[in-house]
A protein has these predicted regions:
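Residue-level recognition of single "structural anchor" positions
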Residues: 1-299
Length: 299
């Protein structure tokens, strides 16, 4: 076979490489799905644990039939990958996502439509976006950041056309809180009010935690109402660190990295900000890319 490969021209080698990489990707996706199939223990319809294996789909995905309700489902029915086609391209697509490649360039690289590229992006983000920590511990840093309101990706804009030079663009508030263990919680707020901030912050506070914020008076009132130890860091008073431990620099650095990463997308629609927050958090949590990282998360 080695001699045969040597006799191939550049175009043939390129085609062979593509076929080999596609086969490897398909095997890795198949292995991840097979591993997932072994974890299925209850019916998606009635939650019964009385299941029978019930053949395969045309794509080779295991089907199950519930003895209790007689309904059937396949192993991907409860995952974002359900009904997604072209599985041989999934891993390469997630690699392009990790690199922050645009939808258009990803579509061209994998010979898929722009619509498919868009749908895949948000399908792979769906699993990370479904998770938000229920509680933060220890030293908790909290603050808001802002992005210009954007209707990018919307067919219908729910406002009158903006006149040229017609004032400032509305800023969308985003609440972010994290602890020193690396857990991050985020939420796009309708308005930057004390009530909205408190609604997001209150469930995150745990016993014995210390809240670190900037000088925003909303946090002062919230901390008093919730009876939580509160450290206010006020730059104008040159107070950036208290007792060598309490600061919001970890959070500020996180926000800076996120906004720096966002620049490659040339603006994102406000409706999708939560997804991009989750996407970035997912990559930060994993540290580096591996071929099955996103596939396993989606399952």
């Amino acid at each position: 076979m080695g001699e045969d490969v040597k006799n191939l021209n550049y175009a043939q080698l390129k085609k062979l490489r593509h076929e080999v990489e596609s086969n490897i990707a398909s095997n890795q996706v198949g292995q991840a799905i097979a591993d997932h199939e072994e974890t299925i223990s209850h019916c998606l319809h009635c939650n019964s644990h009385q299941l029978n294996r019930w053949g395969m789909t045309r794509q080779g995905i295991q089907r199950f039939k519930c003895k209790s309700c007689n309904k059937t489902f396949n192993a991907l029915a409860d995952s974002p990958l359900y009904r997604m086609k072209k599985s041989e391209k999934w891993i390469e697509y997630t690699k392009l996502m990790w690199e922050g490649v645009s939808l258009r360039k990803s579509a061209k690289a994998l010979d898929i439509t722009l619509r498919t590229s868009f749908r895949w992006r948000h399908m792979f983000i769906k699993a990370p976006a479904s998770f938000n920590p229920s509680e933060l511990t220890g030293v908790i840093e909290a603050d808001e950041t802002f992005l210009p309101e954007s209707f990018k990706g919307k067919r219908v804009i729910d406002r009158k056309s903006r006149k040229r030079g017609g004032g400032r663009i509305k800023q969308v508030p985003i609440f972010i809180a994290l602890d020193r263990s690396g857990a991050v919680s985020h939420k796009v707020l309708e308005r930057n009010t004390k009530e909205n901030i408190q609604a997001q912050l209150k469930p995150l506070l745990s016993s014995g935690s210390v809240l670190c914020t900037d000088g925003n008076l909303s946090y002062k009132g919230i901390a008093k109402e919730l009876d939580v130890d509160h450290k206010r860091l006020i730059p104008l008073d040159n107070q950036l660190v208290i007792d060598g431990v309490y600061h919001i620099q970890t959070l500020n650095n996180y926000m800076k990295r996120w906004k720096g990463w966002l620049k490659r997308f040339n603006g994102i629609g406000t409706d999708y900000v939560e997804n991009y927050l989750s996407w970035f958090r997912f990559m930060e949590d994993n540290g580096e890319y591996s071929d099955q990282t996103w596939i396993k998360e989606a399952l």
